[in-house]
Amino acid sequence: YTTKYYGSDIPDSQSFDKQAERASDFLDTITFERLVDGLPDNERAQTKIKKAVCAVSDKLYGLELAEKQALSAAAGSDSKTDINGKSSGIIVSRNSGSESISYASPSEIANGAKAWSAVYSAAGDEQATNKLLYDTANVYLMGVRDNEGTPLLFAGL
């Protein structure tokens, strides 16, 4: 993973196996199941597919960490609560005299996430996550063909 396909984000083999399985499922989806029965015979195509799995695995691992960090930050940060005691916002400032509390707006929260990285901004947003993963895989899979000569990313019949 790290030496042959230059993966770098996943610290252990158990975590890699989990993310690689999820990445393979994602590649099966975007290649319209063309890889379910195995890789193409062409060795260069096989290498590109394996690199795509590793790159998507890295992104999936980063997304998982970002979501865990967001949940942890939300649980540990000050937030406003509604009538039922459920959290409904993040407190960004608080004054004591004559009590004044300011809450982060959704756009402020989103802008902060976008500033971190594409992975953090995609975390929790299914459409952004899918685009990030597709763009990551596309770099490796563009032009790669199956044994019948059909491009893996071709959506036609």
Question: Language-model segments: which ranges?
Answer:
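Divalent metal-cofactor coordination and adjacent catalytic microenvironments
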Residues: 2-157
